[in-house]
A protein has these predicted regions:
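Gly/Trp-centered helix-boundary motif
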Residues: 1-155, 159, 163-164, 289, ...
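Alpha-helical transmembrane segments of integral membrane proteins
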Residues: 125-341
Length: 341
């Protein structure tokens, strides 16, 4: 920690003192890394294959059936019993813990879908025959990435707008506040429903729409900090020396405003994940068939006779959001100098 300034060292010590938030951060990082490497944990392709003395990496490269002694030049189906027998006879295959991908259907199941947890499907299957655990892994990755990107883009826009309003004040601040009041009153959900009837919803499309209407969270915080500090002596001195407004805002005033801003980021991330989950649950989110926690919740509601669907999806969302709330509380304590270590 020697590369941290004394102030940051004290903040890190206060963050670690909040044990609940500290361990929540580590658990969230572990879950995020597992979801980012979902292909290595849940896949319908082997990680590594040794066939007749040759090594193959199906998880990274596509191979045809002819590669493994088949008659056709089509893509190898590693769920095919014939191909599995070929690999077992003439070599070996290293499989991930879950032998199903995000869209793989368990055709070998003898139980109607959705099927309960079993040795092959640890958390059961959904109404379409997909493995619930695999879909949770891939759905968590989409939710975390969506939340991080939405938090990043909306925070940048919000900080920029708040900084300009707070620094210049006057008519710029007045018209900026009136615009935000009007813009924040837009019925976002109805606009998404309307646009969904015209454009096929997708990851980037949803991200753009939610950023367009979700960047106002930090404006008030940053604006208040800039209004408070713009008359400080060091700002006046910089202006008297001819320092540009851009340099004053970015180098001298923004670091002070970021102290209050950073405490909001975990809660914004939590809200971003909830937004995507809610849209998927209502049917206005990701395209049909995409791995999504909200879509699993919807399946749980529509299949009350299969409680494992709703329970697995609910626990996944609840754990993810709870960890982020605990992290947010720890970050808030870390930036509060009145908190004793």
């Amino acid at each position: 920690m020697s590369f941290f300034s004394p102030v940051n060292q004290a903040r890190w010590a206060r963050f670690r003192h909040n044990r609940r938030g500290y361990w929540s951060l580590w658990l969230f990082l572990i879950l995020s890394l597992c979801s980012l490497g979902a292909e290595l944990l849940a896949n319908d392709r082997p990680l590594l294959v040794q066939y007749r003395g040759q090594l193959y990496v199906p998880v990274l490269k596509n191979y045809t059936e002819q590669t493994f002694g088949g008659a056709f030049a089509t893509a190898a189906d590693y769920q095919d019993p014939w191909l599995q027998q070929q690999l077992a006879t003439h070599g070996w295959a290293l499989w991930p813990p879950v032998r199903f991908g995000a869209t793989t259907i368990n055709f070998a199941s003898t139980v109607p879908f959705p099927s309960p947890p079993s040795a092959s499907n640890w958390l059961g299957t959904d109404a379409n025959g997909g493995d619930v655990l695999a879909r949770i892994l891939y759905g968590t990755r989409i939710s975390v990435l969506f939340g991080l990107l939405l938090t990043l883009f909306s925070s940048v826009l919000g900080v920029l707008a708040g900084a300009i309003q707070g620094y210049y004040g006057g008519k710029i601040d007045l018209w900026g506040q009136r615009f935000i009041e009007v813009w924040s009153g837009m019925p976002t959900l109805f606009l998404i429903i309307l646009l969904s009837s015209v454009v096929q919803p997708g990851f980037w499309w949803l991200l753009a729409i939610t950023v367009l209407f979700g960047w106002m969270t930090l404006v008030g915080v940053v604006r208040a900090e800039f209004l408070r500090t713009r008359n400080y002596d060091y700002v006046r001195a910089a202006q008297a020396l001819g320092v540009s407004d851009r340099q004053i805002i970015l180098r001298h005033m923004l670091p002070n405003a970021m102290v209050a801003t950073l405490t909001f980021l975990p809660f914004i991330l939590c809200s971003s994940i909830t937004t995507l989950t809610s849209l998927d649950f209502l049917g206005f989110g990701l395209p049909l068939g995409s791995p999504s926690l909200g879509e699993l919740l919807l399946q749980g509601k529509n299949n009350l006779q299969a409680p494992w669907l709703g329970i697995a999806a609910f626990l996944s969302v609840a754990v993810l959001l709870t960890l982020l709330i605990f992290i947010g509380e720890a970050v808030r304590d870390a930036f509060d100098p009145s908190k004793a270590v």
